[in-house]
Amino acid sequence: FNEAEHVEQVIAQADVILVEPVMQPDYTKARDERKGETGLTPANYKITRELLTGKAKSDAILLHSLPRMDEIPTDVDITRWSRYWQEAFNGVVMRMALLALVLGAME
């Protein structure tokens, strides 16, 4: 565990990069109703394609619980580091299995 002022200071050491939104939007409102109330991620916490390409280990993985805001740009989605889509899919399967177990559909 490391604490740093800028992700750039520690990303080269990371095997797993877990990103979460700094500010949570009000999901009860449509985007056009929010009028910029979403809050922006400080630049020193954003994970960009350039940062990953220039500093991250080639075998590091990038996780995010989704939905994302501006902390990870969409051009990172197609890089070798992104694993958040698989993470989201696996989360659905795990929740289905837990519900089946709790409701007695399986032993």
Give short role names for the model-derived ranges.
Residues 57-107:
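Adenosine-phosphate binding glycine-rich loop
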Residues 1-76:
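Rossmann-like adenosine-cofactor binding region
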